[in-house]
């Protein structure tokens, strides 16, 4: 998360561009009804920390395109169980009005949602396309393999270590900086 506001250097993913690319791909593929499953990080006493930047980017982009539908959005936790529960709820509530595509804020959410869709005999990607976020190892090992936003976590770690070493060499923390890394949209079999 963005620690720059607290006076600390941070290394982040470019969430906004990442979400915009994923949504643009879905829209170009003919999807006009796009849902979102996202987690909410909380403190130890269950107070929300901040609104997830993927949610904010999703909302902003689809509002600009006049495609934003709040009924298609669920906020839970960043877990496969939460993804399963949220998708099951949407299937039960929306039935045939279920969106033709979903953006998932994490691979774990997508794995749970995929299971709920499969249990309801809703074919992916023929009826519902999915794009997730992170490209963890599980994304390519589920069926169908998940289209996902690839986050370069190893490079993020290298950038963080480099910044820390620079601070140590200077003997102070210097001026805090923010390093934002790009992502790549990796298309697999969960979208069409």
Which sequence ranges carry the predicted segments?
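Bacterial carbohydrate/catabolite-sensing allosteric modules
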Residues: 2-192
């Amino acid at each position: 998360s963005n620690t720059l506001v607290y006076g600390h250097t941070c290394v982040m993913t470019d969430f906004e561009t990442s979400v915009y690319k994923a949504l643009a791909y879905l829209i170009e593929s003919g999807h006009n009804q796009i849902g979102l499953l996202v987690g909410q990080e909380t403190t130890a006493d269950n107070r929300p920390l901040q609104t997830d930047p993927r949610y904010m980017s999703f909302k902003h982009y689809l509002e600009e395109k006049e495609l934003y539908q709040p009924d298609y959005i669920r906020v839970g936790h960043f877990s496969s169980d939460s993804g399963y529960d949220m998708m099951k709820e949407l299937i039960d509530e929306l039935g045939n009005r279920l969106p033709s595509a979903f953006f998932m804020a994490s691979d774990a959410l997508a794995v749970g949602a995929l299971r709920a869709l499969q249990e309801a005999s809703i074919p992916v990607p023929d009826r519902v396309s999915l794009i997730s976020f992170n490209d963890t190892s599980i994304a390519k090992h589920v069926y169908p393999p998940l289209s996902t936003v690839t986050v370069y976590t190893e490079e993020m770690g290298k950038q963080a270590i480099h910044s820390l070493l620079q601070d140590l060499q200077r003997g102070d923390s210097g001026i805090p900086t923010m390093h934002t890394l790009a992502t790549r949209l990796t298309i697999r079999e969960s979208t069409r």
